A protein has these predicted regions:
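A detector for small-residue-rich transmembrane helices and their helix-helix packing motifs
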Residues: 1-167
Length: 167
């Protein structure tokens, strides 16, 4: 996805197709492992139609930050499913707030809500730094999309999550 070209009416399909291409094998592997761990239980919980809508929304909405920031930069391009995967992960966290997550590179169990807060803080900070080749705006946009999606389609889930965490 090239925001500069998209803003000028060119290569519009890349808004979607870029979500099916990854920079390298570790990028693809990490996204697909995350999807494999969190996608099936979430799909079972919300149903296939809403799951597909969540994934598609995460993919599309997560590009907005990149678009806003990079639409005047002809050299910027981004790809990968990380925004959609972040949407799935954060919807999962709302539905299973008492679960623990274990990062592959840091094998320490982390409570899901704590992971979510740390992830949001880190991606927000990293998006402001722009020091690496990771699209932190897409990660942040996807995570927020997942949270908003649950609020829109199952607002009672937040009350259940709070009760589970505090109860």
């Amino acid at each position: 996805f090239r925001p500069f070209e998209f803003a000028r009416g060119m290569r519009r399909a890349t808004l979607v197709t870029s979500g099916f291409v990854h920079a390298d094998m570790p990028h693809l592997l990490f996204n697909m492992l995350t999807f494999w761990f969190f996608g099936p239980p979430l799909e079972g919980r919300i149903g296939t139609p809403l799951f597909v809508l969540l994934y598609a929304s995460g993919l599309l909405v997560s590009q907005y930050g990149s678009y806003r920031k990079q639409r005047h930069n002809p050299d910027y391009a981004t790809l990968g499913a990380s925004g959609a995967i972040s949407a799935v992960l954060f919807a999962y966290i709302v539905y299973w707030p008492t679960s623990t997550l274990i990062l592959l590179f840091l094998p320490i169990p982390i409570p899901a809500p704590l992971f979510g807060i740390a992830y949001l803080a880190y991606t927000w900070w990293s998006a402001r730094q722009s020091r690496d080749r990771i699209n932190h705006d897409a990660h942040l946009g996807g995570a927020l999309t997942g949270l908003a999606f649950v609020a829109l389609f199952d607002p009672q889930a937040y009350g259940r999550a709070i009760s589970l965490v505090t109860g």
